[in-house]
Amino acid sequence: FYTHINYHTMYKSLLELIKNEKDKYFFVETGCSAHGTKSTILWDKFINIFDGKVYSVDLNPNAVNITQKQVSKKTTVFCMNSLELLPQIDEQVDFLYLDSYDVDFLNPKPSAEHHLKEFNLIKHLLKPGSVVLIDDTPCSPEWLDGGMKSPIYEKLKKQFDPNMCGKGSLVNLELEK
């Protein structure tokens, strides 16, 4: 697992992991570009260099419209619930990026449960070498030091629980079984 140090380092590391001798890649993203991260645009740029396609899904029509205008025809942005789209996908996934349900670090369970549902709907399409990234899933309390300076994060750091620490916590537990 990678600690969420910064977006540039994280994305660069992930793209190096999946850049191999492949003709085409298939990326699936839940939660399109939001809050300035521009992940969908990054995946689209990768696909335009190395070939393939991107499926991104979001419930917010405004986010979908803005994102669709910024990507190529190799990226399809769906305006629907990810739990409805994922069962319709029938090809192997090279890169899965789960980021559809904003996490409340004081109550991460609803987001974690949603991402576990997403993962379970698509895990049969993952193969050895597939990359799964779940945003906002700190691996250690030091993650909270990375620019998150506020009284609420100081409280979180004191009560940090690696078994319930963000969107991907339940997926992590599932993978450890």
Language-model features: locations:
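A short alpha-helical cap/connector motif
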Residues: 1-177
